[in-house]
Amino acid sequence: MTKKALIIGGGIAGPVTAMALRRAGIDSEVFEAYDRGAEGVGAFLTLAVNGLEALRLLDLHDLVRDLGMDTPVMEIRNARGRLLATTSQPSRTLRRADLYQALRDEAVRRGVRIHYGKRLTGASATANGVRAVFADGGEAEGDLLVGADGLRSRTRALIDPGAPRARYVGLLNTGGYAEGVRAPGRPGVCYFIFGRRCFFGYMIHPEGQVWWFANPPSRREMPPEELAAITPEQWRARLMDLFEGDAGPMREIIAATPDILPGWNTYDFPRVPKWSGERMVLVGDAAHATSPSSGQGASMAVEDAVVLGKCLRDVPDTAKAFAAFERLRRERVERVVAQGKRNGDGKAPGAGGAFVRDLILPVVMRQVEKRNALAWMHDYRITWDERVAA
């Protein structure tokens, strides 16, 4: 009999997992907490080459090729405008909301049902599977449940009520899309600038718009209501002050941005002790959220989806399939999380740390390129036809 999966979360991991399971011969339904079109996600993200190759296994690479822009080059400068490093690695940068919508639409086209306004409140094992309960009073039953419900995963709390909280990494995020500004550079390059008091990144879209983000340091984790109370103009004023005196187009780009995005805290999960239990399993940020500084969050979610599909295809016992999935994924994703933390720590090092960073980073990056030291991250490939052992 064909298995049926209940997938909680309709971001990236959820729809991709549904399509991976479908290819593996497993039916699924996706349950998204927010109403249709209510995601309102204005930020952008980057899919690294390993994530793009994982999408290719599900015939989704053409889908993302129609969104955003290629960003295969990275240039890093300091607050004086000195070039510290240049690296190259295939990647594609796209708006998060566009990717969400494209993946959902494609999942539906392939026969996956997506339900909106379905916030998970509880789940429990039944004689033959699992039952999910939602805030609107509705219920659903399946053979297994996949928690693709992100950083604040309800599924994670159900699997392990004692699961640790996400770790705040000392950085805030904001950004936007600037219009009518002639920023130095060319399309296809991610420009990263270590300002004296704030990190900044920008990309030039082929149509001229400048996509940017900033990471103001904050030792204090700000409550959501406090962040929500900061107006776009207050963010603008704060950022203009943070970048005053730094070399680079930061202030011009910020001034040319009609709507600065609401700020948010940056978190990661160094280790989530339990990934599965009672016919439930975690994927993506629910299992191993990494800070944006890794550049790998979306790619890890896609890889998870494909590997879980293989495990459930090849290992008939659900619990053993979940164990195989964790065995294949945990070491890699936790290494990525650690790399993201190291990258983020360099964004707010203080004056002494900045001096050392500017001295050492060019040497380190040359060695990274020479030795291909990040091959473990970017050269990872999944073979769909390779069987998974229990």
Language model segments and positions:
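Active-site substrate-recognition segment that forms the wall
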Residues: 188-224, 243
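C-terminal helical "tail/cap" subdomain of flavin- and related membrane-associated enzymes
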Residues: 1-3, 66, 81, 252-255, ...
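Conserved mid-domain beta->alpha element of the FAD-binding
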Residues: 7-27, 31, 146-147, 174, ...
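Short helix-loop capping/hinge motifs at secondary-structure junctions, enriched
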Residues: 180-186, 249, 314-315
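Conserved N-terminal glycine-rich FAD pyrophosphate-binding loop of Rossmann-like flavoproteins
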Residues: 36-54
